[in-house]
Every structure is written in structure tokens, then in C-alpha cells.
Amino acid sequence: MDPLDVEDEVDESDTTSLQAQLRQNAIRKQEQFQQEIQERNSMVNRMSAEALQYFNQLHKAECSKKEELQTYIDENLKVFEKKQKRAQAPTKNNERSSSTHAALEEHKAASVTKKKLGIVKKGAPRKTKIRLPVRKSPN
């Protein structure tokens, strides 16, 4: 036997085993993929028509609530913007009423604070300094 013939046989056996490994790997991956598809579809298939209808109703109700909320926000935003424009537009009556209104609020705030009795903290006793003129002695 030639040593070259042995190497050729080894190469052929390695090549075929590599091909077989690749084939087996591809088959295994395909089976795993098919199992994943079955698992994903099995949940939907196991659910009854009533359950599917219930979930669809929940989804529709949620979408309708979102739409209602959005329309409510849009409508109130328009009203708010109108009120804001009115408040920002200076008028003679507004200026007079706002100044008297502010004065009334200050008066009310002062009267409320006077009515409340809270904790009274006494400060440290203050020392009074008495200065006497220094007399110089006649010496």
C-alpha cells in the first residue's frame, strides 16, 4: 500500500462525513423551525371562536376609547385656546377689574393669616447696651 492511497481514502471519508453532518444539521434546523411554527399557531388554533371574538371586542373597545379621548382633547384644546386669547387681550374693564380683584385677594389673604393661631416662637432675649460717657479724672 502506498501512503498516498491511504490519505485519499481518509479525505473521502472526512468529506462524506462533513456532508452528512451538514445534511443532518440542515434537517435538524428545519425540524426546529417547523416546531416553532406549530407552537405559535397552536395557541390561536386552541382558542375557540368565542374567545377570539372576545379579544377582538376588547381591542375594538380600546381603539374606540382612544379615539373618543383624542376628540375630547381636541375639542377642549380649542376652547382653552379661545379662553386664553380672551384673557391675554387687554381691555380697559379687564385692567380695572384685575387690579381691584388683586387687591381683594391680598386683603382676604391677610385676614385669613390673622385669624389663624400658630406656634409663636420667641426670639433670644436681646441685650441692651448702655453707654455712659467716660469722665476723665482731673489728675
Curated annotation (Swiss-Prot):
Region span, Disordered: 83-139
Annotated Polar residues bias: 90-101
Location, primary (coarse class): nucleus
Transmembrane annotation, as ranges: none
InterPro entries: FAM192A/Fyv6_N
Keywords associated with the record: Chromosome, Nucleus, Telomere
Protein's cellular compartments: Nucleus; Chromosome, Telomere
Amino acid composition bias (Basic residues), ranges on this chain: 113-139
GO CC entries: chromosome, telomeric region; nucleus
A Pfam family recorded for this sequence: FAM192A_Fyv6_N
Coiled-coil segments: none
Protein's job: Involved in telomere length regulation and promotes fully efficient non-homologous end-joining (NHEJ) by a mechanism activated in postdiauxic/stationary phase.
Family the UniProt entry places it in: Belongs to the FYV6 family.
Identification of the protein by name: Protein FYV6
Top-level taxonomy: Eukaryota, Fungi, Dikarya, Ascomycota, Saccharomycotina
